[in-house]
């Protein structure tokens, strides 16, 4: 049960995130008077021994943490909505909860009893 808005958010959000955190992947911004471009250094996001740089690891952790938090929030919202819907449609009828509290109290002893009925 995927949300189409989530795909749109990922499609639009990840390039923005990459543009903002480009240096975490080893990109260097160079600006001159006549051009704007991104230049990749000779060693990109991995060092000479094949391990990722700490900035890249941090960026990956942040992205997946945000994604997990978003999925958790959406899941909890759907769960709450479903529980409210079930509570409204599949409740049980308990007439005892609708009874008045004073109805179960025995009558006080000083009340007069009605006269006894007799046969004609």
UniProtKB/Swiss-Prot annotation:
Glycans are attached at residue 36. Its main location: membrane. It is a single-pass type I membrane protein. Residues 1-26 form the signal peptide. Residues 84-120 are annotated as: Interaction with EPB41L5. The chain crosses the membrane at residues 60-80. Preferentially expressed in epithelial tissues. Expressed at high levels in lung, kidney, and colon. Expressed at high levels in retina, colon and mammary glands. Moderately expressed in liver, spleen, pancreas and prostate. Moderately to weakly expressed in the placenta. Weakly expressed in skeletal muscle and small intestine. Residues 27-59 are extracellular. Residues 81-120 are cytoplasmic. GO terms for cellular component: apical junction complex; apical plasma membrane; bicellular tight junction; cell junction; extracellular exosome; plasma membrane; subapical complex. Residues 87-120 are annotated as: Disordered. Changing residue 36 to D: Abolishes N-glycosylation. No effect on localization to the apical cell membrane. Keywords: Cell junction, Cell membrane, Glycoprotein, Membrane, Signal, Tight junction, Transmembrane, Transmembrane helix. A motif (PDZ-binding) lies at residues 117-120. GO terms for molecular function: protein domain specific binding; SH3 domain binding. The keyword Acetylation does not apply. One of its GO terms (biological process) is establishment or maintenance of epithelial cell apical/basal polarity. Residues 90-99 have a biased composition (Polar residues). It is found in: Apical cell membrane; Cell junction, Tight junction. Involved in the establishment of cell polarity in mammalian epithelial cells. Regulates the morphogenesis of tight junctions. Involved in promoting phosphorylation and cytoplasmic retention of transcriptional coactivators YAP1 and WWTR1/TAZ which leads to suppression of TGFB1-dependent transcription of target genes such as CCN2/CTGF, SERPINE1/PAI1, SNAI1/SNAIL1 and SMAD7. The PDZ-binding motif is involved in the interactions with PARD6A and PALS1. Component of a complex composed of CRB3, PALS1 and PATJ. Interacts (via C-terminus) with PALS1 (via PDZ domain). Interacts with PARD6A. Interacts (via intracellular domain) with EPB41L5. Interacts with WDR83. This is Protein crumbs homolog 3.
């Amino acid at each position: 049960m995927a949300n189409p808005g989530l795909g749109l958010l990922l499609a639009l959000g990840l390039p923005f995130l990459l543009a903002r955190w480009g240096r975490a992947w080893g990109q260097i911004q160079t600006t001159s008077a006549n051009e704007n471009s991104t230049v990749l250094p000779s060693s990109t996001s991995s060092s000479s021994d094949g391990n990722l740089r700490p900035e890249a690891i941090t960026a990956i952790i942040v992205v997946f943490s945000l994604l997990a938090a978003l999925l958790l929030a959406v899941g909890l919202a759907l769960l709450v909505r479903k529980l409210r819907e079930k509570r409204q449609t599949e409740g049980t009828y308990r007439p005892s909860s609708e009874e008045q509290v004073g109805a179960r109290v025995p009558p006080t002893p000083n009340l007069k009893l009605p006269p006894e009925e007799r046969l004609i």
